Design a protein with these regions (language model features):
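Glycine-rich loop-to-alpha-helix module at the N-terminal edge of alpha/beta enzyme cores
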Residues: 54-144, 154
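Terminal low-complexity tails and localization/encapsulation signals of metabolic enzymes
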Residues: 2-58, 91, 95, 145-171, ...
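A structured beta-alpha segment of the ubiquitous adenosine-cofactor-binding alpha/beta core
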Residues: 156-157, 224-246
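Conserved small-residue-rich beta-alpha loop and adjacent elements
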Residues: 146-220
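Residue-level signal for inorganic ion chemistry
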Residues: 53, 89, 111, 133, ...
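ALDH superfamily catalytic-core signature
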Residues: 252-311
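Active-site pre-lysine segment of PLP-dependent enzymes
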Residues: 206-215, 230-241, 252-263, 279-287
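Short beta->alpha connector loops at strand-helix junctions that form conserved
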Residues: 192, 197-199, 227, 248, ...
Length: 311
């Protein structure tokens, strides 16, 4: 009886702990007007740690009202941000670059926990995104216009690069830091505002990047984050206040976004699924070649544009 009592107690504690953990799983917030906001969503997606299957966070399927609020916030912020000195925007990117470097390990750990790639690969994910932020710091040369004097009598031509307005980005799950960093830093430094929809499967890195962006001094509303699936993508493609969309991901989603967005008069860049070619030369080391090709099939579960796909 005593042994059974002990076993029962252990089982009870075990089930009790599991129930407690389940009820206290953190939720992924929205980022609207410079604040991390709890969603009022009725539908949520569980994000699992691929190594342990533990639920690490719950991601909301945002209702339309919250997505509208994010776009309205970006639109309101555009008025002042687009008129901010280009040197001020550049200094903000310098500060942001420094903060990402300091928090690289934290970002990598979040990626590994949610997405599953190794810490080394996760740090590479952050580093490649950081390089784009560094490029954004050269905005003073990126924003140069053009001039052509004397094209006719008493006539010169000058062209200027001006911000578009509210831009949006839809990013995939395989590079949770790198691909968002391909998008919003360049949009911001050129005077645009931004609405980001990260992958609902691993949004943690994007939320940390928002925290660092706020610390870098970017004004409230300049960048906003929403969460969701197909409905959120359609919302971005159809909202009249969103002027441009950047997408990286699968062929099916990319074609949908390109067709739907351009039909509504938006500038769309759609980087769809791709793979590298592999050419095996006659003098190649066969063992090394097989190891490399086999390795590619498992990196990021095979979903990486750089790898060679075997069919």
């Amino acid at each position: 009886m005593e042994i059974r009592g002990i076993l029962f107690k252990r089982l009870f504690l075990s089930f009790g702990q599991r129930a407690f953990v389940t009820s206290t799983v953190p939720t992924t917030k929205l980022f609207i007007n410079g604040k991390f906001v709890e969603s009022s969503a009725s539908k949520w997606i569980d994000v699992h740690n691929p190594a342990t299957n533990e639920v690490v966070t719950r991601v909301p399927i945002c209702p339309k009202e919250e997505m509208e609020e994010a776009v309205a916030s970006a639109k309101a912020a555009f008025k002042s941000w687009s008129n901010t000195s280009i040197l001020t925007r550049q200094q903000t990117m310098f500060h942001y670059q420094s903060l990402i470097k300091k928090n690289m390990k934290r970002l990598a750990e979040s990626i590994t926990e949610e997405q599953g790639k190794t810490l080394v690969d996760a740090e590479g994910d952050v580093f490649r995104g950081l390089q784009v932020v560094e490029h954004a710091c050269s905005v003073t040369s990126l924003q140069l216009g053009e001039s052509l004097p004397s094209i006719a009598q008493n006539m010169d031509i000058h062209s200027y690069r001006i911000p578009l307005g509210v831009c949006a980005g839809v990013t995939p799950f395989n590079f949770p830091a790198m691909i968002p960093l391909w998008m919003f830093p360049l949009a911001l430094v050129c005077g645009n505002t931004f609405v980001l929809k990260p992958s609902e499967r691993d949004p943690g890195a994007s939320m940390i990047l928002m925290e660092l962006l706020k610390e870098a001094g970017v004004p409230d509303g300049v960048v906003n984050v929403i969460h969701g699936q197909h409905e959120a993508v359609t919302f971005i493609c159809e909202h009249p206040d969103i002027k441009a969309i950047s997408f990286v991901g699968s062929d099916q989603a990319g074609k949908y976004i390109y067709e739907r967005g351009s039909k509504n008069g938006k500038r769309v860049q759609s980087n769809m699924g791709a793979k590298n070619h592999g050419v095996v030369m006659p003098d190649a080391n066969k063992e090394h070649t097989l190891n490399q090709v086999s390795r590619d099939q498992f990196l990021t579960t095979g979903l990486w544009m750089k790898i060679t796909q075997v069919e």
